[in-house]
Amino acid sequence: MKSTTLQIKTSSHTQMLDITRQIQDAVTGSSVKSGICTIFIPHTTAAVTINENADPDVVRDFTTEINKIVPWEDGYHHMEGNSAAHLKSSMIGFSEQIIIEDGRLVMGVWQGIYFCEYDGPRTRKVIVKITEG
């Protein structure tokens, strides 16, 4: 099993960053030809998801709609003032698994891997575990 940790610097309070290239680079560097790539976000106010990366309007729509579902101000009880970030992260999720074949991530032509920031800007970690098999 190979492991790497990526450092991600976000520049906005809410942001989706396409990290597909960095994840593929980790897979390539592992020399694993067939297996599973697990992506884990060790934060409670950030997430990871797979979505379309061909049209930037998809990211804009995603961000707009999740902000409607979970508004920043809504009478939350959590005293740190970032309850919405915790809720969004739990809804989107902290991990993804992607099949590796021939040393490449098996993804649809329009799919990309997105790091989702919900309480930025911050420096974040993305843990990538690559399992051969």
What is the predicted role of each segment?
Residues M1-G133:
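Active-site histidine-anchored catalytic micro-motif
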